[in-house]
Structure formats: C-alpha cells, structure tokens
C-alpha cells in the first residue's frame, strides 16, 4: 500500500526527525489514524444519544518498531521543543500530576498507565516518531493520537484485542482517568470504526456499528474544515467540562424529581420535555437551555440519517446548520473565531450548512459545500477572515476533506 502525497511529506518529516534525534525506526511500521467529522449529535455522546460521522483525511502518522528493551522512546515532529519523550514501562508520572500538564508526553504516559492498570502486560518498548496535520481543535487530534499509540504498543507486544469497543474504552480512560479530560466516546468511536466512503452510525444502547453510504443521486459535495488558527488547550480546561457537568447535574435533579432517566437522551417525548421546561425553566434556565439543544438535536438526528440514506445532502446540510445555531445559542459551547468562520461561509451560495466542530471554544468549524462552490468559499474566507480576526491571519487554514478509513497500517516503507 502506497502513501499519498501528504503521507509521503509526513514520512519525510518523520525520517528527518528520527535521524536528528537518534530514534531507530529502520525496518519498522507506519500506522496512520484519521481525524473525524461529526454530523450528529455533537456533544451527544456523554448525553447518551446516537452518533453519526465520518473519518476524514487529516492524520497522525506514527513510524515505530520494537526496540528490544523496556523503554519507550518517542519524538513528535509537531512538538520538537519537548525533545524525546522517554520512560521505562511500569514507571510513569502519577495521573493528573503537574509533571505531565504541559507536555504531549502525557498521552504515552497515560496509555502505559491505563494498559497496565487494566492488566495488559507490556514488556516490549518501542522507538517511534510521530507527525500530524490535524487542526488543534474540532477534529479529535487527541483521540487519534491515543488510538494510534495504543494500537502500536499492542502490536509491538503481540497483544490482540478482538472487541474494538474495548479499545475505545481504553482510549477514553487515558483522557478521563490519567489526563483529566472529561471526553466521551464519540471521537474514539468515529475514528476507530471509520471506513472509506462510508458514514458510521453508532447506537450506544448496544454499542453496535452500522455503515451507511450516502444515497444514490446525492449532489456532489465536499466536507470543508475551517481551522480558525486557534488552539484549545484541552477539554479539561474548556467550556466542555462545564457543559458536561451541567448536563449531569440536570440528570441528577430530574432523577430526584422522579423522572425515570439515566441521561438527557432518555428525554424523547415532547410532552415530558415541555413538562421539564415548565417545571425547571425558571429555577434552572441554563440547564434547561442545555436540554433544549440535546432534545432538539436528537429529534433532528433521525431526519438527518434518513436524508443521508436518501441522498438528500441538502437536508443534511440544513440540519447541520440548525444544530450549529443550537450549539451557539442553547448549548453555548462555540467561540468567537468559530462563529466568524460560520458567518463568512454562510453568505456564500452553495454552502449547504456550517457549524462549529468538536469540544468548542477554539479550533475548527466545518461546512458541507456543493463541489462547484468550494473555490468561492475559500476566496470568501481568505478575504474576510484575516480582516475580521487579524491575530490569526497567518494561522488559519482551509481543508477540503475526503472520507477515509480511520486506521491504516503500512509495512515495508522504512
């Protein structure tokens, strides 16, 4: 299997980094993990909703090989100032400690910690070099990195895990329990299970996956990611953590009021929803706003799925846009730069829908765009965004994404 042009460029960076930093990857393997683009329900995973999304072609590449010792030695081409992250298996910093707060090394540390805690015997260290081109927020860079390292350490140690949802759980535990980031399972699921050319539907009730191609006759469209040039420091330091806590608080309040629910997604009946708003809207207006977004987005989700299967990308785009308005106005999870991007592209004919992506505050927005309108959208962004957000005039980026496999392994290239 050959690398794409972008993959070869990444490999060139990896090979130079390996040479400059004394990392031996000769004869090893390359694992590529994707980013993800969620079509619904954004912020639904920790609220119990069904999910739908695709893997997208912004990646993290890891070139690695077993080194015959109990040491892990890793270098990131994206964070060269951190130098080589090196540690012995079984000897990593404590979870959430000050020692890990400012280094990307918290991810491999956390993976070693969680795998050991869960009973996996890691005896074989690796040498590896990483490089990625996933934007700094909105496309699940941390989940992609975590999955890549878990799979690579399993491979080096001859560990096979048949149940892929277990790998999702391990990746989530690294962020939840070690790093302190309160992420759900959306990102890991949408990346690990992603298939080229397919939408991935996830049902949390039985953790089943269904692959859905877009229906025949769909208009030719592109997934566009609008990287604002801002970089979110991490979910644990973001509005995401506050919103998740608010949703959990509302569930607790409703349970004490004898509502038979375990998560906000359990509120599907409009009569029950209206009763809750009437009962708690005055005493807990912010919490009811969060419910308003989840309730309406969940109802729209089923219409979006049917539209996707029917090839009606126009309706998919309309729902994507309305979800964005709900995320901005009711969930209040967006950010000024994210909304600037949305405001710019919304005015361009051929844009079917646009909204913020991912955890919120910073990072990237996304749009569904008719193929013939992509260049006009790019010109609009290039003209208006630097003028509106001069601090990020040299940092923003415009990505036209393909739907790809979430994980690929390359051999014989090193």
Sequence positions of predicted segments:
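C-terminal nucleotide
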Residues: 1-36, 40, 61-101, 114, ...
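A short glycine/serine-rich beta->alpha loop
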Residues: 26-27, 43-50, 92-101, 131-139, ...
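Glycine- and acidic-rich phosphate- and metal-coordinating loops
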Residues: 112-135
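DPxDG-like acidic metal-binding loop motif
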Residues: 55-58, 139-159, 366-369
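Beta-strand segments within the central parallel beta-sheet cores of soluble alpha/beta enzyme folds
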Residues: 75, 124-131, 161-173, 317-319, ...
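Phosphate-handling active-site elements
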Residues: 117-125, 153-167, 371-392
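Alpha/beta catalytic cores of group-transfer enzymes, especially the acyltransferase/condensing modules
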Residues: 159-209, 355-356, 413
């Amino acid at each position: 299997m050959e690398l794409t042009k972008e993959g070869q460029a990444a490999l060139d960076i990896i090979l130079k980094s390996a040479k400059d930093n004394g990392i031996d990857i000769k004869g090893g393997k390359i694992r590529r993990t994707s980013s993800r683009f969620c079509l619904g329900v954004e912020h639904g995973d920790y609220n119990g909703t069904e999910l739908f999304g695709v893997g997208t072609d912004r990646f993290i590449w890891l070139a690695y090989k077993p080194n015959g010792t109990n040491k892990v030695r890793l270098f990131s081409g994206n964070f060269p100032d951190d130098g080589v992250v090196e540690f012995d298996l079984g000897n990593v910093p404590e979870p959430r400690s000050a020692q890990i707060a400012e280094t990307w090394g918290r991810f491999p540390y956390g993976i070693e910690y969680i795998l050991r805690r869960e009973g996996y015997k890691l005896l074989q260290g690796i040498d590896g070099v990483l490089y990625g081109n996933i934007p700094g927020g909105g496309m699940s860079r941390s989940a992609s990195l975590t999955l890549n390292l878990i799979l690579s350490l399993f491979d080096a140690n001859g560990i096979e895990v048949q149940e892929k949802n277990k790998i999702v759980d391990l990746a989530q535990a690294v962020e939840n329990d070690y790093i302190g980031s309160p992420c759900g399972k959306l990102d890991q699921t949408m990346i690990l299970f992603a298939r080229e050319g397919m939408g991935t539907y996830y049902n949390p009730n039985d953790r089943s996956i269904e692959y859905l191609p877009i229906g025949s006759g769909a208009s030719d469209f592109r997934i566009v990611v609008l990287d604002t040039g801002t970089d979110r420091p991490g979910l644990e330091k973001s509005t995401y953590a506050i919103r998740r806590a608010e949703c959990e608080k509302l569930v607790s309040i409703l349970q004490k009021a004898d509502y038979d629910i375990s998560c906000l997604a359990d509120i599907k009946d409009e009569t029950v929803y209206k009763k809750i708003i009437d009962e708690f809207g005055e005493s807990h207006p912010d919490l009811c706003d969060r419910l308003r977004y989840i309730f309406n987005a969940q109802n729209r989700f089923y219409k979006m799925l049917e539209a996707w299967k029917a090839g009606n990308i126009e309706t998919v785009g309309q729902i994507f846009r309305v979800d964005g308005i709900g995320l901005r106005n009711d969930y209040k999870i967006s950010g000024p730069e994210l909304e600037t991007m949305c405001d710019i592209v919304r005015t361009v004919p051929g844009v079917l829908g646009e909204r913020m992506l991912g955890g919120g505050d910073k990072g990237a927005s996304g749009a569904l765009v008719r193929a013939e309108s992509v260049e006009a959208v790019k010109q609009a962004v290039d003209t208006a965004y630097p003028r509106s957000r001069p601090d990020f005039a040299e940092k923003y980026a415009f990505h036209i994404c393909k739907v790809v496999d979430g994980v690929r392994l390359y051999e014989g290239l090193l």
